[in-house]
Amino acid sequence: MVANTHTTLLCFSNLGQVYWLKVYEIPSAGRSAKGRPLVNLIQLSEGERITSMVPVDEYDDNHFILMATKSGTVKKTVLTEFQNQRKGGKRAITLEEGDELVGTTVTDGNKFVMLVTNAGKAAHFSETEVRSMGRTAKGVRGIKLDKEQHVICLLYTSDAADEVVS
């Protein structure tokens, strides 16, 4: 992740909330420091944890936030939907009971997406197949899962022929 001190970090939680954090609000520390818990910087609720952070320098209509949930749902929302900040966070995606947000990324709308499951199953598709939705929408199915399977990772590439190794 590359960011300067005025970059905003969009912090997405497992419960589908988004929180905003300016890089300059994160205390500086040496490389041997223990760090500081995010709950001291962001107001998280009980059982909530940050699953991904996305740096944003500028909000525009040409970029999107792509999200994936544990149940295989994907959602693409225009970046400008996230520019109005609230201290207590905002809903980024509406989740079904028992579902969790597992990954997010900023895209230009033309990337290729890969969803990977705990069983080693993967689905690779063009992001153009996912239409843009409002901030509180639920999303669409990105991968069909068998019982006991869940998505563990969201990856993206700029070309269908790119090799993805994780």
Where are these regions (language model features)?
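Duplex nucleic acid-engaging cores and interfaces of nucleic-acid transaction enzymes
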Residues: M1-E81, Q85-R86, E97, V102, ...
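Extended intrinsically disordered, low-complexity coil regions enriched in Ser, Thr, Gly, Ala
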Residues: E81-K87, A123-K138
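Elongated, amphipathic alpha-helices that form coiled-coils and helical stalk/scaffold elements used
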Residues: T94-L101, K144-E148
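Membrane-topology segments of multi-pass transport proteins
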Residues: V106-D108
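Intrinsic, low-complexity N-terminal interaction/targeting segments
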Residues: H150-C153
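Single conserved hydrophobic/aromatic residue that forms the stacking wall/gate
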Residues: Y156-S166
